[in-house]
Regions:
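Extracytoplasmic small-molecule ligand-binding "clamshell" domains
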Residues: 33-111
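Periplasmic-binding protein-like
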Residues: 54, 131-138, 186, 208-251, ...
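Short, low-complexity disordered leader/linker segments with a strong preference
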Residues: 1-45, 272-274
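Short loop->beta-strand "edge-of-pocket" segments that line small-molecule binding or catalytic clefts
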Residues: 46-52, 148-164
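Ligand-binding cleft/hinge of the Venus flytrap
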Residues: 76-85, 164-182, 211-215
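Short helix-initiation/N-cap motifs at beta->coil->alpha
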Residues: 88-99, 143, 180-194
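Flexible hinge/capping segments at coil-to-helix
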Residues: 41, 126, 139-156
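A ligand-binding cleft/hinge motif common to bilobed small-molecule-binding domains
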Residues: 96, 113-121, 169-170, 191-194, ...
Length: 274
């Protein structure tokens, strides 16, 4: 009898251990988020929610009627259409853009987002789709600023985010008199026009568009970029399925000429990376 009870206890112990191990395995799988249905969630919702700074022309900004337009917006609309959903555009506070993405307030960050190491630690990126440089903009009459080295002792303006990070990592930041940070580039340009700062550090695509459209007496300091950058689309690290599909569609758009057409519309040339 004792032998039977002992055998029963052993079998019961093994059975219970197996159940516990199985439960741990299931829990780990769920908490790790290995079942990625991010693309299907977008399809079920019927929309792709894009987060942006709606002052970042020409990537995503408000036109005279208040509608949000831009190069990235046109790309995203086409991608959403090919997925089979609508595009919802959601302006966000760019200084907390990654938080908005990871909280689930938006599905993608798509607004001239610079790919850098600090962001890659928090989110995933699509393939780079655009090359960009961080450049210096000055008033046309400032003959004392002709190179990066001339920024020593000057008051500089920069938007909070990747541009701010890039400037801070450059040795010239330690030689500047002051670095003023702005939520949006437009406010930096307003201070430049009012001579409250000496130069603005900004993405080249945004600078060239602003100077052309606003007809301001600003110029780009030639042959003196602070960095070479790449733009990508930001995704939550769990949303690999959605990222893969967006990359596939963007490759498809490059191959069929759609990306080139959109680029011609906004930049008068095809600048999309092949």
């Amino acid at each position: 009898m004792k032998s039977i009870l002992k055998t029963f206890k052993i079998i019961l112990s093994i059975f219970m251990s197996a159940i516990i191990l199985m439960s741990f395995g299931c829990s780990e799988k769920n908490s790790a988020g290995t079942e990625d249905n991010s693309l299907q969630k977008i399809k079920d919702a019927g929309k792709l929610v894009l987060g942006l700074d709606d002052t970042f022309a020409p990537m995503g900004f408000r036109d005279e009627s208040g509608e949000i337009v831009g190069f990235d917006i046109d790309l995203a609309k086409e991608v959403a259409s090919r997925i089979g959903v609508e595009l919802e555009i959601k302006p966000i506070d760019w200084s907390s853009s990654i938080l908005s993405l990871n909280k689930g307030d938006i599905d993608v960050l798509w607004n001239g987002v610079t790919i850098n190491e600090s962001r890659k630690a928090q989110i995933n990126f699509s393939k780079p789709y655009l090359n960009n440089r961080l450049i210096i903009v000055k008033p046309k009459d400032r003959n004392d600023i002709n190179s990066k080295e001339d920024l020593a002792g000057k008051v500089l303006g920069v938007q909070v985010g990747s541009n701010d990070e890039a400037l801070q990592s450059d040795p010239i930041s330690k030689e500047a008199k002051e670095i003023r940070k702005y939520d949006v580039n437009v406010n930096a340009f307003l201070d430049l026009r009012a001579k409250r700062i000496d130069a603005v550090i900004i993405d080249e695509v945004a600078a060239q568009y602003y100077i052309s459209e606003e007809k301001v007496d600003f110029v780009v300091v030639e042959n003196s970029p602070l960095t070479e950058e790449f733009y990508g689309i930001g995704f939550r690290k769990t949303d690999v399925e959605l990222l893969t599909e967006v990359d596939r569609i963007l490759d498809e758009m490059k191959a069929d000429g759609t990306s080139a057409e959109i680029s011609q519309k906004w930049f008068a040339k095809d600048i999309v990376l092949k």
